[in-house]
């Protein structure tokens, strides 16, 4: 078979879509809409570029390169290992796994518990949640085969119901842009798109799409790339429609109830809306859907991270660590992190993602232009990633210190000298400079 038929392409599109859309993706677009208010359109455009466009380009890049390791090894094999570990820790126990517990807690339990008992309720909930996740992770196929069939459609139905209810309710008077969205809405939306972590996931899991296409007897590599592009285009259209609808939902919610951008999250926006439109039943139903979906995602991530580290680090400090041991480590660590709360996890994850995302972006762009650039000037990978890495990690350190109420004067002053740094895009000029140095470095090799 040289190409897929329409039905197979549709299946690939929904497979692609299911990789990138989960319960966690539901909370960010509404928060963008609630904060941006009357300026939601430019904010949503920025969000869609980074939350939809970049992940799809990432999958294409991994397909063209033949896998994540081959792509990242163009910088160096050690860098490929470092970036792989950083990505797995980010989409695993440091941020994404704990976020599944905190998100579902905020949706299911927090609205019904007095704030004075919130910390105790979260402790008990996260203990039960991660115990179940660990048990399900021993036999993930039993959970995924059942939940995977209906959770995606159920989430889509839920979004449709919320959107239609908002259309019937009417938008009212949109709130004025607030917080970080008071100015530069496109740039802020672009940066908040990092929170989905889908580009990082695309770099590591993107090869799965091309493998599924090859399993349909498509053996010509150029056709595999075309079919991947078709699936990516279809997925992009779906995500744009969904994120646009959810942003509108956020605008309506923001007009109904005022939020505090420094304390509230997208979960707060959704619970405010469902409580207003559907009462207690609506809030409880939304919470149940989130718990089931988040539990399914958490189970898969625990297994994925354990498999990755068991494969690459069979011994640590002279001791052999089994697959089950890695599962225990990641489950316990995620339980501890989750009790910091959703807002705290998001605040800390933003600086970390600001370090990883620019590196991922330039890797993707260099891979997509490999034939005309990287193949002729191999050193562009090294120099571009090096300079972007310096700029983005400096930004990460500065932002992390600021999260905890401190500052590093000389570092902040140095970063302020970078063009576009006011938009958190200070890595762009170093990237261009890295390409130029990489091209100039080629004759000396």
Where are these regions (language model features)?
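Selective recognition of specific alpha-helical transmembrane segments in multi-pass small-molecule
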Residues: 53, 57, 154-166, 228-255, ...
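Hydrophobic, membrane-embedded alpha-helices of multi-pass small-molecule transporters
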Residues: 11-21, 165-172, 181-246, 285-298, ...
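A generic transmembrane alpha-helix motif of multi-pass inner-membrane proteins
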Residues: 169, 178, 189, 378-445
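Hydrophobic alpha-helical segments and their helix-loop junctions in multi-pass secondary transporters
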Residues: 93, 97, 156-181, 199-200, ...
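Membrane-water interface regions at transmembrane-helix termini and the short interhelical loops
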Residues: 63-71, 129-151, 215-218, 335-347, ...
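Membrane-interface loop-to-helix entry segments
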Residues: 136-166, 349-361, 380-390
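Helix-loop-helix connectors at the membrane interface of multi-pass transporters/channels
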Residues: 32, 102-121, 214-215, 298-328
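Hydrophobic, small-residue-rich membrane helices and short re-entrant helix-turn-helix hairpins
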Residues: 139-150, 186-189, 209-238, 256-271, ...
């Amino acid at each position: 078979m040289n190409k897929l038929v329409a039905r197979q392409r549709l299946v690939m599109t929904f497979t692609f879509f299911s990789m990138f859309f989960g319960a966690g993706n539901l909370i960010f677009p509404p928060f963008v809409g609630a904060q941006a208010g009357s300026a939601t359109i430019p904010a949503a455009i920025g969000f869609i570029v980074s939350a939809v466009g970049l992940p799809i380009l990432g999958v294409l890049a991994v397909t063209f390169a033949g896998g994540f390791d081959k792509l990242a090894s163009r910088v160096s094999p050690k860098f490929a290992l470092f970036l792989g570990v950083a990505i797995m820790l980010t989409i695993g126990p440091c941020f994404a796994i704990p976020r599944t517990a905190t998100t579902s807690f905020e949706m299911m339990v927090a609205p019904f518990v007095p704030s004075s008992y919130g910390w105790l309720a979260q402790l008990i909930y996260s203990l039960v949640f991660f115990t179940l996740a660990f048990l399900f992770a021993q036999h993930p196929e039993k959970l995924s085969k059942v939940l995977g069939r209906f959770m995606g459609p159920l989430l889509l139905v839920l979004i449709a119901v919320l959107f239609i209810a908002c259309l019937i309710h009417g938008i009212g008077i949109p709130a004025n842009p607030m917080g970080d969205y008071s100015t530069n809405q496109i740039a802020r939306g672009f940066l908040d798109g990092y929170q989905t972590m889908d580009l990082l996931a695309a770099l590591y899991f993107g090869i799965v799409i091309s493998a599924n296409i090859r399993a349909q007897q498509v053996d010509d590599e150029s056709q595999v790339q075309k079919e991947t592009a078709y699936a990516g285009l279809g997925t992009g259209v779906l995500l744009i429609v969904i994120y646009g609808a959810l942003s509108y939902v956020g605008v309506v919610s923001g007009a109904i109830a005022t939020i505090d951008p420094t304390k509230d999250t997208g979960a707060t926006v959704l619970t405010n809306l469902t409580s207003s439109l559907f009462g207690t039943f609506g809030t409880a139903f939304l919470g149940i859907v989130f718990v089931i979906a988040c539990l399914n995602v958490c189970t898969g991530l625990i297994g994925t991270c354990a498999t990755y580290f068991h494969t690459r680090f069979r011994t640590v400090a002279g001791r052999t660590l089994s697959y089950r041991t890695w599962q225990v480590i990641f489950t316990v660590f995620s339980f501890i992190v989750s009790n910091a709360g959703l807002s705290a996890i998001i605040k800390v994850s933003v600086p970390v993602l600001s370090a990883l995302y620019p590196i991922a972006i330039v890797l993707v762009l260099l891979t997509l232009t490999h034939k005309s650039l990287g193949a002729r000037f191999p050193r562009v990978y090294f120099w571009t990633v090096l300079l972007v890495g310096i700029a983005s990690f400096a930004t990460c350190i500065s932002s992390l210190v600021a999260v905890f109420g401190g500052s590093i004067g000389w570092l902040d002053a140095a970063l302020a000298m970078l063009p576009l740094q006011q938009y958190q895009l200070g890595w762009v000029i170093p990237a261009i400079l890295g390409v130029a140095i990489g091209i100039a470095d080629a004759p000396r090799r």
